[in-house]
A protein has these predicted regions:
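Structured-RNA-binding interfaces characteristic of tRNA pseudouridine synthases
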Residues: 1-259
Length: 259
């Protein structure tokens, strides 16, 4: 029987979410935990991949379990095996044809920054210097909305069949200010039907250049039209990036028995 699993993780100690040879990954830890309980391999199919150092407040994956396997207390048992920086929230039954990656309707990422030195933000927020113009960055971010070719924000070596993505929201949200009204923490929020590798970090890096006045607001449209990675800014560091939400159609979820 197929199940969707919902979990979160701090990506600081992992070489990304997806399994790869001779590397510690989130998928590898999940498959190890399932195998210990099931006493047999249990391949996990992730909803997507995150790079090394990137975090997820909500990630989904699907796994096929034996029909007779009891799922009561499974979340508790798996959390007892998983490392402290991976937390399983729930396991829900889905249709046999449901796919964690291909059935996703949208994904939302947040990029979190701070202007202050804070030891409690190490690895979870990117520290930037003051002076960012958030009004300019939000005007530039508005150019991202819609279905467009985002090759300029993609890794150069990639095997994707299309660079088109549909972005439905992209904006900066002010989180904290000091007593003088200066921004000390902010978050960039972006939602799309799909994302290219390194896309969010490349967008944020380009927005930083606009925010600091190194580029004009109109340059964002020029970068998009170039279809060339070298036209965009440097990628922002991985540490401030979080996958925060993945949306699915309700039709793929099976009714949960209350008996």
């Amino acid at each position: 029987m197929r199940y969707f699993i919902c979990f979160s993780y701090c990506g600081s100690n992992y070489q990304g979410s997806q399994s790869q040879p001779n590397a510690t990954t989130v998928q590898g830890e999940l498959e190890r935990a399932f195998a210990l309980i099931l006493r047999q391999p249990a391949p996990i199919v992730m909803a997507g991949r995150t790079d090394a150092g990137v975090h997820a407040e909500q990630m989904w994956a699907h796994v096929d379990l034996p029909d007779t396997f009891p799922t009561e207390h499974l979340v508790f048992r798996l959390n007892g095996i998983l490392p402290a920086d991976i937390a399983l929230q729930r396991i829900v039954p889905v249709c046999e044809c449901a796919h964690a990656r291909f059935d996703a309707l949208s994904r939302t990422y947040e990029y979190r920054i701070t202007m202050q030195k804070d030891p409690f933000h190490i690895g979870t927020r990117t520290r930037v210097r003051r002076g960012l113009d958030f009004e300019r960055m939000n005007r530039a971010a508005n150019s991202l909305i819609g279905k467009q070719d985002f090759q300029s924000f993609s890794r150069t070596k990639t095997d994707v069949k299309t660079f088109f993505c549909t972005i439905t929201q992209a904006y900066w949200r002010i989180e904290k200010t000091d007593i003088d009204g200066n921004v000390t923490e902010a978050t960039f929020v972006i939602t799309a039907n799909r994302f290219l590798r390194n896309m969010v970090r490349a967008i944020v890096g380009t927005l930083f250049e606009i925010g600091y006045g190194k580029r004009t607001v109109e340059d964002m449209e020029t970068v998009i039209a170039a279809h060339d990675r070298s036209a965009a800014g440097d990628s922002a560091p991985a540490s401030g990036l979080f996958l925060t939400h993945i949306a699915y159609p309700s039709s793929i979820f099976m009714p949960i028995s209350t008996k």
